[in-house]
Amino acid sequence: GQDICELELDTAALCGLDAGGRRSGLFFYRLLLVRDQDTLFTDSRNNVDFTLGADGGQAFRLLVYDGGDPVPEWFGQGVLYHVFVDRFRRGAGAVRYQTGARGAVMEPDWAHGIPPFAERQGDSLANNTFFGGNLWGVAEALDYLADLGVRVLYLSPIFRAYSNHKYDTGDYLAVDEGFGGEAALDALLDKAKRYGIAVILDGVFNHTGDDSRYFNRYGTYPDTGAYQSPDSPYRDWYEFSEWPDRYASWWGIPILPKLNHKNDVCRSFFTGVDGVGARYIRRGIAGWRLDVADELSDDFLDEFHASVRAAGEESARKPVIIGEVWENAAEKTAYGRRRRYLQGGQLDS
């Protein structure tokens, strides 16, 4: 036979209230079986099944989510489709690629062309070979995507950048002209709305490219970048140990200088009422996917969530925020702190 036991937890009493007046948190617990001769503890490896043993083992985990701001209902009601813009489809609209010594190299063979690869791991690679996919092409394919049941379209980064992948952002306030620029994004959003398809953008807010308006290592932009002068308005957006060539970068990759979100001006540029996050929500996107979200601070995520949700109050669809978090986002510890991505007020997924 089997013994069946039921356990009721009063989560309100368990959680208490945090500083914001919410009941949420991550809790660890074990069940004890007390017998005449000994006490056994549960040991759960997967948070579902368990074995009994004399020592503590691994605890069950209980994530209590603040229900005051739930995940948008529309998210998850259809297929989510990811598009890597340069390799999806060439559209008929106008485009303009960067030229010059650091400009784009076009690959004419869409079906069989092979982009350059580094000979050895760690070798530098330009990543400036383009196959010609653009936002016009994405818009032209919406009828096909709708027939597949797609209701959410998640795009790879579209902001102006040197590379084909655009994870080295050059200007957060400009859609890359090689992808069709502002006109192509507006056309895509307008058509997607008619098809009932939500569009999510990829936000790379942990770092920029070194070839950016803000760092401007190569003098591509008219602004004085942090690399060019210690008097640059963007100097404190980055962390230099020895200006100009020693600075914090994403995983030590020098072409991706890391942004200093401890600087209020830098952080507000993304998270403020008129910041990047809110600006594009008001323009018509349905949400953001945050690149390397586990490297963004709690302050950044809290403020970004608040500004994006507030901007969404003006639109018909509540915006969603998705984060790239390696390992288990419900219980992850990053940079010495237990993170609260999924407890409410930061990430929806």
Regions found by a protein language model. Give the residues of each.
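A generic secondary-structure signal
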Residues: 141-144, 191, 275-279, 307-311
